[in-house]
């Protein structure tokens, strides 16, 4: 069992990583006997895990209600959020309730925002079931729903009480979802840890076959890096922005193509190549390093070119609505070397469009 602590003073919390955690009531601390829980999951995961998690919580004396959401990025919306509020109010659940998010990034982000908003804030626990959510979205307190004009535009910073990562969940993950998660894994190597990127080049095949020790190390290292960044910059005023490598471009793809048609990790993979091409055009990143990124993403089963039906010009309106925009100016996360990156302002739209075009016709 691995345990990492996100250090945020009195709001610090543990990330527990192991197999078989759904069999152990202690995995769901700080829940105690007699407490009330609303378990939020989706229609795909409910048949796999709902009864198991409900059973282990009830074994610990916890009173469990549940709400099952439709599955898909297109349901990360205010309308679906309202169904969670309605379920909480109908029981009713008070301010002493705990929301448990059992699912991937959509369930985790939406449940976290529900917890931040319901009666001005209730406790919640993240139980991520996808690789992407285990290494990224469940850690750090970013909660949100989407708007038709932009991804994650309505949300709050709100930290969980704990994160429970059961590695056994990955055994039921479709290959496309596994690849999507690997995009976020590769991101950490590009922006923060060149040695980890090297390790990924050597061990990607082991990750693709869900080798236990390799996957445990991979998730632990990603969570360590995320925890360090969040502890230093919880509300993304500086360092934490680096975690958005590829996201400015990627969110544009997701919004333009319709939420759910491209998985988040697929869009981020293309976005990271576009960021690398932008950095190349600025003369601060080598084509050889871009090729290393492309090769690793391709081996992981991820796209490296943007959708053909989306013109370079179609990216700009979405990118100019990005949450990192300041004074109307885009701020891009760009690699400087494998393992080093920067936040860059003042890049001309023409250069960005040319970098996007590099990835459309490649």
UniProtKB/Swiss-Prot annotation:
PANTHER family in UniProt? 3-DEHYDROQUINATE SYNTHASE, 3-DEHYDROQUINATE SYNTHASE, CHLOROPLASTIC
Query: Which of UniProt's keywords are assigned here?
Result: Amino-acid biosynthesis, Aromatic amino acid biosynthesis, Cobalt, Cytoplasm, Lyase, Metal-binding, NAD, Nucleotide-binding, Zinc
What's its EC?
A: 4.2.3.4
Which organism does this sequence originate in? Escherichia coli O81 (strain ED1a)
Q: Which residues bind Zn(2+)?
A: 184, 247, 264
- GO MF terms on file? 3-dehydroquinate synthase activity; metal ion binding; nucleotide binding
Q: Its annotated pathway?
A: Metabolic intermediate biosynthesis; chorismate biosynthesis; chorismate from D-erythrose 4-phosphate and phosphoenolpyruvate: step 2/7
Q: Which cofactor does it need?
A: Co(2+); Zn(2+); NAD(+)
Keyword Nucleus assigned:
no
Give the signal sequence positions: none
**Listed name of the protein:** 3-dehydroquinate synthase
Pfam families the UniProt entry points to = DHQ_synthase (PF01761), DHQS_C (PF24621)
Q: Which residues take part in binding NAD(+)?
A: 71-76, 105-109, 129-130, 142, 151, 169-172
**Cofactor binding note from Swiss-Prot or TrEMBL:** Binds 1 divalent metal cation per subunit. Can use either Co(2+) or Zn(2+).
Give the protein's function: Catalyzes the conversion of 3-deoxy-D-arabino-heptulosonate 7-phosphate (DAHP) to dehydroquinate (DHQ).
Is Nucleotide-binding among this UniProt entry's keywords?
yes
């Amino acid at each position: 069992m691995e345990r990492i602590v996100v250090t945020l003073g009195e709001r610090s919390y543990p990330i527990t990583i192991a197999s078989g955690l759904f069999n152990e009531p202690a995995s769901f601390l700080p829940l105690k006997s007699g407490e009330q829980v609303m378990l939020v999951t989706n229609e795909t995961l409910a048949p796999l895990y709902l009864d198991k998690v409900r059973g282990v919580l009830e074994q610990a004396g916890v009173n469990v209600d549940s709400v099952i959401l439709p599955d898909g990025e297109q349901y990360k919306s205010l309308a679906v959020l309202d169904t969670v509020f309605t379920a909480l109010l109908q029981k009713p659940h008070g301010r002493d309730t705990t929301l448990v998010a059992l699912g991937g990034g959509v369930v985790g982000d939406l449940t976290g925002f529900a917890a931040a908003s319901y009666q001005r804030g209730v406790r919640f626990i993240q139980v991520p079931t996808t690789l992407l959510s285990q290494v990224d979205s469940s850690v750090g307190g970013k909660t949100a729903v989407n708007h038709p004009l932009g991804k994650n535009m309505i949300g709050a910073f709100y930290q969980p009480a704990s994160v429970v990562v059961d590695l056994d969940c990955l055994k039921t993950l479709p290959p496309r979802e596994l690849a999507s998660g690997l995009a976020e894994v590769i991101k950490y190597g590009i922006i923060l840890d060149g040695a980890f990127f090297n390790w990924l080049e050597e061990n990607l095949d082991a990750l693709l076959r869900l080798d236990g020790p390799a996957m445990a190390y991979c998730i632990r290292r990603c969570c360590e890096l995320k925890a360090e960044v969040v502890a230093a910059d919880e509300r993304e005023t500086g360092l934490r922005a680096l975690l958005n490598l590829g996201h400015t471009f990627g969110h544009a793809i997701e919004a333009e193509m319709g939420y759910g048609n491209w998985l988040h990790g697929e869009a981020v993979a293309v976005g990271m190549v576009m960021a690398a091409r932008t950095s190349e055009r600025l003369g601060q990143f080598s084509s050889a390093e871009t090729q290393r990124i492309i090769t690793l993403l391709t081996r992981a089963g991820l796209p490296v070119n943007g959708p053909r039906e989306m013109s370079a010009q179609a990216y700009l309106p979405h990118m100019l609505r990005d949450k990192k925009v300041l004074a109307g100016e885009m701020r891009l996360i760009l690699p400087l070397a494998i393992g080093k990156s920067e936040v860059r302002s003042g890049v001309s739209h023409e250069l960005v469009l040319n970098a996007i075009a590099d990835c459309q016709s490649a």
